[in-house]
Amino acid sequence: MASCVLLHTGQKMPLIGLGTWKSNPGQVKAAIKYALSVGYRHIDCAAVYGNEIEIGEALKENVGPGKAVPREELFVTSKLWNTKHHPEDVEAALRKTLADLQLEYLDLYLMHWPYAFERGDNPFPKNDDGTIRYDSTHYKETWKALEALVAKGLVKALGLSNFNSRQIDDILSVASVRPAVLQVECHPYLAQNELIAHCQARGLEVTAYSPLGSSDRAWRHPDEPVLLEEPVVLALAEKHGRSPAQILLRWQVQRKVVCIPKSITPSRILQNIQVFDFTFSPEEMKQLDALNKHWRYIVPMITVDGKSVPRDAGHPLYPFNDPY
């Protein structure tokens, strides 16, 4: 069993979870079943990933009374998509996720991004020129609607994803249910030290997405640095008899940062949770800390006039224009 962090709600959140972004239907069900069989007790989902129905099939077969895993031992996260920020749309969006996942409640529900897209069922509403159609709903209004889900017992904890420090404080200024978790891209090239400190001072735990550098994403640039080929990481892997991925994950869990590596390959799913039986010295941690160069891999891109441009960078609530 992976060790945990304790949320301010009293919930235990396992430090390693299975990520499901880019896990295709047809593959994700077997991946979840295998992950549960080798001790994973944390699954990270999102409505926009388009695979919650199949994840739900895996959960129905393996979780609950008389099944391999009791429901109360499993920590399931999902995320509210940008088209569902309007307060009138929030509960219905959650209920669809619960129905798809075949669950009665979520352990954690995150606002996926701070800004809202145009309301409706097309997840990426676009103008004729390829740019996104936005909605003016502010995340503080969305947060109030999310709080009602906790009161109804549909969600145990709320959190944020891709919010910067200023936006987190903005939520805290209006929250009666305080966010418990911030989920952001985080790895040695983007260590997020300031943001993590900011969260810890305010009672939020941090989850790292793309903790291995997300080399399989669509808008990858051919000459960008490859985290899994970083010499410092390879040297530590050789020294400890571990894989490069295990080195990257151990660094995070030793910092008490939750990780959600995505894999559909059984050998890698198993490897990714085997990071609790070795430890880095302070010097080894410093070697990995020194790799930080504020390199962000995950910036959603769109094609406008034949050019690839950041999808949302012009939006006033875009989170990544701030230092952290």
From Swiss-Prot:
What name has this protein been given in UniProt?
Aldo-keto reductase family 1 member A1
Q: Which domain of life is it from?
A: Eukaryota
Pfam families, sorted: Aldo_ket_red
Q: What gene, per UniProt, encodes this protein?
A: AKR1A1
Q: What is its main location?
A: cytoplasm
| Residue numbers of N6-succinyllysine PTMs | K126, K144
Q: Where does NADP(+) bind?
A: 10-21, 44, 161-162, 210, 212, 214-215, 262-265, 268, 271-272
List the keywords (alphabetical): Acetylation, Cell membrane, Cytoplasm, Lipid metabolism, Membrane, NADP, Oxidoreductase, Phosphoprotein
Where does the record place a coiled coil? none
* Residues at the catalytic site: Y49
The UniProt function text for this chain reads:
Catalyzes the NADPH-dependent reduction of a wide variety of carbonyl-containing compounds to their corresponding alcohols. Displays enzymatic activity towards endogenous metabolites such as aromatic and aliphatic aldehydes, ketones, monosaccharides and bile acids, with a preference for negatively charged substrates, such as glucuronate and succinic semialdehyde. Plays an important role by catalyzing the reduction of D-glucuronic acid and D-glucurono-gamma-lactone. Functions as a detoxifiying enzyme by reducing a range of toxic aldehydes.
Membrane as UniProt keyword: yes
Q: So what family is this one in? A: Belongs to the aldo/keto reductase family.
- List, alphabetically, the Gene3D superfamilies matched: NADP-dependent oxidoreductase domain (3.20.20.100)
Q: Does the keyword Cell cycle apply?
A: no
Residue numbers for the site described as Lowers pKa of active site Tyr? K79
Give the catalytic activity.
a primary alcohol + NADP(+) = an aldehyde + NADPH + H(+); L-gulonate + NADP(+) = aldehydo-D-glucuronate + NADPH + H(+); L-gulono-1,4-lactone + NADP(+) = D-glucurono-3,6-lactone + NADPH + H(+); allyl alcohol + NADP(+) = acrolein + NADPH + H(+)
